[in-house]
Amino acid sequence: DADLAAVYRAVASLADETVRTMAIPLLSTGTFAGGKDRVLQSLNHLFTALDTTDVDVTIYCRDKSWEKKIQEAIDMRTATELLDDDTTVMKELTRVHPDSCLVGRSGFSTVDGRLHSYLEGTRFHQTAVDVAERPTLWPRREEANEQITHYVLGESMEAIRTKCPVDDTDSSAPPCTVPCLCRYAMTPERVHRLRAAQVKQFTVCSSFPLPKYKIPGVQRVACSAVMLFNHDVPALVSPRKYREPSISSESSSSGLSVFDLDIGSDSEYEPMEPVQPEPLIDLAVVEETAPVRLERVAPVAAPRRARATPFTLEQRVVAPVPAPRTMPVRPPRRKKAATRTPERISFGDLDAECMAIINDDLTFGDFGAGEFERLTSAXLDRAGAYIFSSDTGPGHLQQRSVRQTRLADCVAEDVHEERVFAPKCDKEKERLLLLQMQMAPTEANKSRYQSRKVENMKAEVIDRLLGGAKLFVTPTTDCRYVTHKHPKPMYSTSVAFYLSSAKTAVAACNEFLSRNYPTVTSYQITDEYDAYLDMVDGSESCLDRAAFCPSKLRSFPKKHSYHRAEIRSAVPSPFQNTLQNVLAAATKRNCNVTQMRELPTLDSAVFNVECFKKYACNNDYWDEFAQKPIRLTTENITSYVTRLKGPKAAALFAKTYDLKPLQEVPMDRFVVDMKRDVKVTPGTKHTEERPKVQVIQAAEPLATAYLCGIHRELVRRLNAVLLPNVHTLFDMSAEDFDAIISEHFRPGDAVLETDIASFDKSQDDSLAYTGLMLLEDLGVDQPLLELIEASFGEITSTHLPTGTRFKFGAMMKSGMFLTLFVNTMLNMTIASRVLEERLTNSKCAAFIGDDNIVHGVKSDKLLAERCAAWMNMEVKIIDAVMCERPPYFCGGFIVFDQVTGTCCRVADPLKRLFKLGKPLPAEDKQDEDRRRALADEAQRWNRVGIQADLEAAMNSRYEVEGIRNVITALTTLSRNYHNFRHLRGPVIDLYGGPK
């Protein structure tokens, strides 16, 4: 709306003394209106803008109904209202909103009067003065409006003034009394009433512009009654002065003269007295200062240099344009002669060739079959309808949900592969963007350069990988899959409560911890002596060798600075990469568990696969998978690299320099690497014993780079072959998961959870064979399967101090590219073996990695023993009950929403609280992202329908009380960045040499 008004104002600015006529179509209508009727909206902006000029305007339109609307609007504006002699016009009239309590009182009107007033003499005067002060403190309208919302929610004027970054401000101007005509108009009166009612949440419409980010307590709706006028008061335009009629000499040229223009009044009425123009208020009754006449269709004069002198718009006519696309344009008919002989102006003479061109058929180009209907019927009403993209990366707003439908029931749909646009290498553009960034080092230029640089890297990596895998790259035949989409989940309203101070919020969290975990809050880490002094940079510690550079040995550790954590959960900072820690990790965490089983290895594996297919799968696809194997293709390597984010693409670019071909990559080589982060579990364990070092057995980087391309196809095939009630969480958002589970979990329903101890280590030979057989059945091509098989199975190694050679059994290596996928398949296989028909008949079962839940199943005495005897797995079984002991899955609780009657998953607030007590490196810059993530979770915790369930969940799992106070505190801390910074204490410097 604002852009449309600005365009018309720009057109009006082109008028000067030499431009007396304009021919203009209505902008943003027809095909360009986005499926909406914008005729009157566009027309009103045209009136408002061109009222400041002195031109005669011809409006072109092709639609008869539009012509009628436009003519009626012009007639309404040019109509003259006759007033009685004894009528008194009230000059001090203030226009107010139709819903105002001031309607009908002396000095106030709903159709006429001033639009800006302090509302003196009313109880809303002080509020109007306060509202008017905002634009002087914050010139940007969005920022000023945001402060008004804070004022409504109870913030004092003094507090708002202290937030202003400057000391000196101008005097205020009266606020607008009618910003729009809908029920949510933010008039001074409504602001006063909302503030007096001490509301915690209120609604504003789109006529009250706010910043893009979410403001707590403020809901936004589209304005249902926009005021279609420009808030800026038009400049004063003196009335047009008409010259005395005189006979002008005819053109002496021998050519044809076309389109003569009449200047002068054709009206029989005398002009009225000039009236100073007022801001356009009501389109129904407007006094015109000039006589009315109709004129002929006039051509548009050639563009001339614009001048700034404004004129008043006085005459308009609607001239219909022929509707067909190819039709001879006839010269317009002459109108009846005027009462006075007009002055004739000739626009120049045209030769015969130009006349022939003018009289020819005009052809605008025809639409293809169905093209026009498709353009006009395109529904562009949802978020993401308009996709903006940079010159490199993919379009924004195109991340669509893959598991949800807008229908009310579950539907089956074909799976369509998402189209990926391969990156193109353009070194010249990268060089130019680098120069541009060096000359003007702004954030925007830096971002453009980095985008192009990453794009070039990706293009080069794709070429390298395709070259290295050329023996394996073959064309493939696609399978047709069906997926099930679920209705979009419903959530109850989120009502947030905030504490007045962030310091109070931190104190509330610490008080909760001290009451429930007294040993945690009393625990102190002695910073100065917490690390060994054998710091080594650049060490490499593998299972059978260790290497470091002697020149990098130091007598004291590097300097280490971090913010002290204000929340006293005593979580240690990340492990330092010292030789001591790395070797401790390598020696303590590298052995698999003992294998004990009854069936022979291969028999057990075959039985596993048969149970998986019988109890967890349909039988629609296995034959097709065998006929259409999964191979490495150009498309899936391209797709994998294209989706990589910048840092990972740069790392892969470095690793693929001078790369080996795929057939020479050692698939069985794994390097032990240490996870630096400490695993956080709510409780006191981390204070009672030294935190365990987690280890990644990192596969050869090139093995991952070459073979990751087949992962998406494997996921698609697995999801297609599973029963409709069995789900994996691959490629799924939290909202997608809520959509899947929302209808199935009801209060009192039994839910089976299993917690498998040391899942990766416990996988023996039979489970390794099971994984390989399932990969083969899903259609992985034989050459690729041989490569993958080398990374399963046993590894031979050497004990460094003694030189003893030993073998690892077939444990799962956490750094292999298929670890999560195979773990999920084996998890479902274990459930199929021990539950059998109970899994098939369950309403809903979900699996990811070693985590699972199965609805409607209660455990029996044999369940854990079967897992141990048949599958070599030590399993802890939890019988959860909805609403009494809510189930725990993927780091969150599945709770029932009492308002919507559906269930959803919410994150574990206690785990979140413990994580906030982790020390943060001093140079960290990610706090705003952390705050935003915490704010999203806080919004979910504050849903009104899940409060009772969340309390029950925390009580049953952790036996803690008062989690509501913690949620209020976390909501307060996540409210803004200023609050969130209260989690970070002063910077502490460790080491760095003798003191």
From Swiss-Prot:
Polyprotein P1234: Specific enzymatic cleavages in vivo yield mature proteins. The processing of the polyprotein is temporally regulated. In early stages (1.7 hpi), P1234 is first cleaved in trans through its nsP2 protease activity, releasing P123' and nsP4, which associate to form the early replication complex. At the same time, P1234 is also cut at the nsP1/nsP2 site early in infection but with lower efficiency. Signal peptide: none annotated. GO terms for molecular function: hydrolase activity; metal ion binding; nucleotide binding; poly(A) RNA polymerase activity; RNA binding; RNA-directed RNA polymerase activity. The keyword Ubl conjugation applies. ADP-D-ribose binds at G30, F32. This is Polyprotein nsP1234. InterPro entries: DNA/RNA_pol_sf (IPR043502), Macro_dom-like (IPR043472), nsP3_ZBD (IPR048891), RNA-dep_RNA_pol_alsuvir (IPR001788), RNA-dir_pol_PSvirus (IPR007094), SAM-dependent_MTases_sf (IPR029063), Togaviridae_RdRp (IPR047311). It comes from Middelburg virus. SUPFAM superfamilies: DNA/RNA polymerases (SSF56672), Macro domain-like (SSF52949). Residues 749-864 form the RdRp catalytic domain. Viral replication produces dsRNA in the late phase of infection, resulting in a strong activation of host EIF2AK2/PKR, leading to almost complete phosphorylation of EIF2A. This inactivates completely cellular translation initiation, resulting shutoff of host proteins synthesis. However, phosphorylation of EIF2A is probably not the only mechanism responsible for the host translation shutoff. The viral translation can still occur normally because it relies on a hairpin structure in the coding region of sgRNA and is EIF2A-, EIF2D-, EIF4G- EIF4A-independent. It catalyses: RNA(n) + a ribonucleoside 5'-triphosphate = RNA(n+1) + diphosphate; RNA(n) + ATP = RNA(n)-3'-adenine ribonucleotide + diphosphate; 4-O-(ADP-D-ribosyl)-L-aspartyl-[protein] + H2O = L-aspartyl-[protein] + ADP-D-ribose + H(+); 5-O-(ADP-D-ribosyl)-L-glutamyl-[protein] + H2O = L-glutamyl-[protein] + ADP-D-ribose + H(+).
